A protein has these predicted regions:
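An amphipathic alpha-helix signature
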Residues: 25, 40-44, 64, 68
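Sec-dependent signal peptide recognition
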Residues: 1-8
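Bacterial signal peptide processing site
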Residues: 17-19
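C-terminal motif of bacterial Sec signal peptides marking the signal peptidase cleavage site
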Residues: 12-15
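Surface-exposed, charged secondary-structure patches
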Residues: 65-109, 115
Length: 142
């Protein structure tokens, strides 16, 4: 009787340490998918409290509610056309902008880029950046 009980405890403890935070690329994909569904609540869950936003100035998303509002204000969704890992926790994402539910995208078909820094499975920096020329052939770059 003692052996099965001890075995259960060992199995339970070994399962506790096995999880790891999602990769930066996985977090970016999840954020993009949530935004494309207009699921601002889910998109916001991927941001750490205190996340920095660099887009026409700088802002800090101090709370989850701030992150929900910021995501809800984005006019476009985007199809990821390229992800480039820039170190363990940073990803450059290139998007083709598209409409998203209940929004009016101001640049459908254009490309946009953002650098994401991710720590412990949460976005700590979202920085809009110019689209590298090699990813914008014939397209309008914003």
């Amino acid at each position: 009787m003692r052996v099965p009980a001890i075995l259960l405890v060992v199995l339970a403890l070994s399962a506790c340490g096995g999880s790891k935070a999602a990769s930066a690329s996985d977090v970016v994909r999840a954020w993009s998918a949530a935004l494309d569904r207009n699921d601002n609540e889910q998109a916001a869950r991927l941001f750490a409290d205190g996340a920095q936003i660099v887009q026409n100035g700088e802002a800090t998303l101090a709370t989850h509610a701030d992150a929900v509002r910021w995501n809800a204000a984005l006019p476009c969704g985007g199809r990821i056309i390229h992800l480039e890992l820039q170190g363990k926790n940073q990803v450059l994402a290139i998007f083709e902008l598209q409409e998203r539910p209940q929004h009016s995208c101001d640049g459908p078909g254009s490309q946009a880029a953002a650098v994401f820094q991710v720590k412990n499975g949460r976005i700590v920096l979202w920085h809009q950046t110019p689209v590298p020329a090699q990813y914008a052939p014939g397209g309008q770059v914003i």
